[in-house]
Curated annotation (Swiss-Prot):
UniProt GO BP: ribosome biogenesis
Family in the record: Belongs to the TRAFAC class OBG-HflX-like GTPase superfamily. OBG GTPase family.
Taxonomy of the source species: Bacteria, Pseudomonadati, Spirochaetota, Spirochaetia, Spirochaetales
UniProt: GTP binding residues: 167-174, 192-196, 213-216, 280-283, 307-309
Main subcellular location of this protein, as a coarse class: cytoplasm
Family matches, as PANTHER family: DEVELOPMENTALLY REGULATED GTP-BINDING PROTEIN-RELATED, MITOCHONDRIAL RIBOSOME-ASSOCIATED GTPASE 2
First-tier enzyme category under EC: hydrolase
Gene: obg
Name this protein carries in UniProt: GTPase Obg
Cofactors that this protein relies on: Mg(2+)
Purpose: An essential GTPase which binds GTP, GDP and possibly (p)ppGpp with moderate affinity, with high nucleotide exchange rates and a fairly low GTP hydrolysis rate. Plays a role in control of the cell cycle, stress response, ribosome biogenesis and in those bacteria that undergo differentiation, in morphogenesis control.
NCBIfam families assigned to the protein according to its UniProt record, in alphabetical order: Obg_CgtA (TIGR02729), PRK12299.1 (NF008956)
């Protein structure tokens, strides 16, 4: 499990150019050959590139320093030094790059395979062969390589969750997302604990799933009551909906009906999304009987049962997430 990062700072540097070479041709029968010092290689660039299978910025640490390679120095016999290797920083789609010092946005990478050169490497210095003239037949100097550049950047990722947890207030969404991810969604026993989406990431075999703990829905949400419009705006972007229903309450079917009705009224297309019905709080009295009744009533739905405190059904639920989401 990894903490989801939607913003972090990186200090990136392009490579220095290699120094030009001071060299003179020395061959048999040519004791005083002319200058033959080659040019230095260019320094590596800093390139940001979108990678299709990335969903988070978790490849990097906040404040991490990353550098492209320096160019190699020139050599005799007019041989140029090798160019420094570019630094390629892979990011998910919808990543914005800011100058952290000025807070100005520099670039926006939205689509797969988008790429941008953020910093050019330093130019290689000229070798002394370039400075030979009718008045300077044996130049004993060459150019140093140009220094690379450094930027303090802030990356910001626009979050789009694969899975949206929906339910009435206190259905257990925040506790569930805290259980299966590194998120620490604020948990308390009163309605509207979640007022904005909280995001967590589940990682299995280097595949990431982004899960959003969305604000609790109430009856009338489709009319803007409570946090309705905000809730429904966020939910429309997710691939899969997870209806979390508290089966320790005898009103479990009413909770299901409210969720279905509010989605239908706001946008009937939301009901076409893939969904799982998850019965929560199986550890409480009467919950198992209600869970069995829920499965019987919703026989055509995929219904799973969990208990966060007894760890019942958690692994099965995570496996179900990965089987449904297109990684």
């Amino acid at each position: 499990m990894h903490l989801f990062k939607d913003s972090l700072n990186l200090i990136v540097s392009s490579g220095n150019g290699g120094a030009g070479c001071v060299s003179f041709l020395r061959e048999k029968f040519k004791a005083k050959g002319g200058p033959d010092g080659g040019d230095g290689g260019r320094g590596g660039d800093v390139i940001f590139k979108v990678k299709s299978n990335l969903k988070t910025l978790s490849l990097y640490r906040n404040g991490q320093k990353l550098s492209a390679s320096n160019g190699k120095s020139g050599m005799g016999l007019k041989k140029s030094g090798a160019a420094g290797s570019d630094l390629i920083i892979f990011v998910p789609p919808n990543t914005s790059i800011y100058d952290a010092d000025s807070n100005c946005m520099l670039f926006e990478l939205k689509n797969f395979d988008d790429e941008v050169v953020v910093l050019k490497g330093g130019r290689g210095g000229l070798g002394n062969v370039n400075f030979k003239s009718s008045t300077k037949r044996t130049p004993r100097f060459a150019q140093p390589g140009e220094s690379g550049l450094t930027l303090n950047l802030r990356l910001e990722l626009s979050l789009i969750a694969d899975i949206g947890l929906v339910g009435l207030p206190n259905a257990g969404k925040s506790s569930l997302i805290s259980k299966i991810t590194a998120s620490r969604s604020r948990v308390a026993n009163y309605p509207f604990t979640t007022k904005i989406p909280h995001f967590g990431v589940v990682r299995v075999s280097y595949n990431d799933l982004i899960i959003a703990d969305l604000p609790g829905i109430i009856e009338g949400a489709s009319k803007g009551i409570g946090l309705g419009f905000e809730f429904l705006r966020h939910i429309s972007k997710t691939q899969i909906l997870v209806f979390l229903i508290d089966v320790s309450s005898d009103d479990f079917m009413s909770a299901y009906d409210i969720l279905i009705n509010e989605l239908r009224v706001y946008d009937i297309g939301l009901l076409k999304k893939k969904r799982i019905i998850v019965a929560s709080k199986l550890d409480l009295e009467g919950a198992t009987e209600n869970f069995n009744q829920l499965k019987s009533i919703l026989s055509e739905e995929r219904v799973l049962g969990i208990s966060i405190y007894d760890n019942i059904g958690i692994n099965e639920l995570v496996s179900e997430f990965f089987s449904l989401v297109k990684i």
